[in-house]
């Protein structure tokens, strides 16, 4: 989760989020290089004493400033397209989770198992434990197995919501009457926090998401205890 004075992205907990961070750093490096080059050229333009009143065109420089940006755009576009297709790919899931957005809480259904569904509300500040996180903790966490392909189906019951967990690189809009899906792979145990990322009304800020990633054997025990 994000902490105080955190200037970077959250630590990744999935392979796709790791790739997104690499692409962010790659694009940022290119932007810094462009900024330095343009800044240097502007400095040299403003602070030199050379003026040529008869220079009408420069074919070589025009070719350079046409071809060079095209090459730079290719270096950004190709990794971006690769990531776009990777994020859109749905692998054979081990577990399917359905998330339904409401004003202002989430409902969850484990589609592969019988009778496992619950609502997840934010814990109010006056009911929060001393080790809890204000405006982020919920009464019912989503329990998912680590090192397994997870598919999530997202929809909404009233207005548009957005199910977002930054550490997993997941952001899916929940639209009434429509079912959106994506998949992710959690590669370590822990708690991962997210929030609704689509303005959905007065209490939009108060519908957090908490995922508890556990080993597969603990997940099976949790499923068995909730099925009985």
UniProtKB/Swiss-Prot annotation:
Q: Where does Cu cation A1 bind?
A: 161, 196, 200, 207
One Pfam match: COX2_TM
Has keyword Mitochondrion?
A: yes
> Membrane topology for this entry?
Multi-pass membrane protein
GO biological-process terms attached to the record: ATP synthesis coupled electron transport; mitochondrial electron transport, cytochrome c to oxygen
Question: Where is it located?
Answer: Mitochondrion inner membrane
What the entry lists under SUPFAM superfamilies is as follows: Cupredoxins, Cytochrome c oxidase subunit II-like, transmembrane region
Record text on cofactor binding: Binds a dinuclear copper A center per subunit.
Its cofactor is:
Cu cation
InterPro entries named in the record: CcO_II, CcO_II-like_C, CcO_II_C, Copper_CuA, Cupredoxin, Cyt_c_oxidase_su2, Cyt_c_oxidase_su2_TM_dom, Cyt_c_oxidase_su2_TM_sf
The molecular function terms of the Gene Ontology recorded here are: copper ion binding; cytochrome-c oxidase activity
TM ranges are 27-48, 63-82
Key word Magnesium present: yes
Outcome, altering residue 39 to S: In strain: Mysore
Sorted keywords for this record are: Copper, Electron transport, Magnesium, Membrane, Metal-binding, Mitochondrion, Mitochondrion inner membrane, Respiratory chain, Translocase, Transmembrane, Transmembrane helix, Transport
**The EC number(s) this enzyme carries:** 7.1.1.9
Q: Which residues bind Mg(2+)?
A: 198
Q: Per the similarity annotation, which family is this?
A: Belongs to the cytochrome c oxidase subunit 2 family.
Subunit: Component of the cytochrome c oxidase (complex IV, CIV), a multisubunit enzyme composed of a catalytic core of 3 subunits and several supernumerary subunits. The complex exists as a monomer or a dimer and forms supercomplexes (SCs) in the inner mitochondrial membrane with ubiquinol-cytochrome c oxidoreductase (cytochrome b-c1 complex, complex III, CIII).
Its biological purpose: Component of the cytochrome c oxidase, the last enzyme in the mitochondrial electron transport chain which drives oxidative phosphorylation. The respiratory chain contains 3 multisubunit complexes succinate dehydrogenase (complex II, CII), ubiquinol-cytochrome c oxidoreductase (cytochrome b-c1 complex, complex III, CIII) and cytochrome c oxidase (complex IV, CIV), that cooperate to transfer electrons derived from NADH and succinate to molecular oxygen, creating an electrochemical gradient over the inner membrane that drives transmembrane transport and the ATP synthase.
Query: PANTHER family under this entry?
Result: CYTOCHROME C OXIDASE SUBUNIT 2 (PTHR22888:SF9), CYTOCHROME C OXIDASE, SUBUNIT II (PTHR22888)
Q: What is this protein called?
A: Cytochrome c oxidase subunit 2
Source organism of the structure: Drosophila melanogaster (Fruit fly)
**Gene it is expressed from:** mt:CoII
